[in-house]
């Protein structure tokens, strides 16, 4: 299993005090089905004591990409256009 973060995600995770250990643990939980599967290789996972949400893209079953992070208090969910964009990225 390989876990990657975009530059933007890494900066946001650091500012929200989310550790790499927590991110790796979240991937293991995602593999166990403890995340919301949004289709097309896109997953939504709760992080940091349920305060933040991460969008994770899965590629080939062993590569995972953290791409987007948002606080639940700032944004209730991603919209359908954003979801379509994440699905398109997950294809490539």
Regions found by a protein language model. Give the residues of each.
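Amphipathic alpha-helical protein-protein interaction segments
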Residues: 51-52, 63
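Sequence-level motif detector for i,i+2 pairs with an aromatic at +2
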Residues: 1, 40, 61-62
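Mixed-charge (Asp/Glu-Lys/Arg
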Residues: 20, 24-25, 32, 85-91
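A short, surface-exposed loop/turn module that caps and links secondary-structure elements
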Residues: 24-51
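Arg/Lys-rich, positively charged N-terminal/basic patches that mediate binding to nucleic acids
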Residues: 1-18
């Amino acid at each position: 299993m390989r876990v990657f973060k975009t530059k933007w995600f890494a900066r946001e995770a650091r500012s929200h005090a989310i550790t790499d250990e927590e991110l790796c643990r979240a991937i293991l939980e995602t593999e166990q089905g403890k995340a919301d599967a949004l289709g097309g290789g896109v997953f939504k996972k709760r992080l940091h004591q349920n305060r933040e949400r991460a969008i994770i893209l899965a590629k080939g079953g062993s590569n995972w990409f953290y791409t987007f992070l948002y606080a639940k208090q700032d944004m209730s969910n991603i919209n359908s256009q954003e979801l379509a964009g994440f699905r398109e990225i997950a294809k490539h």
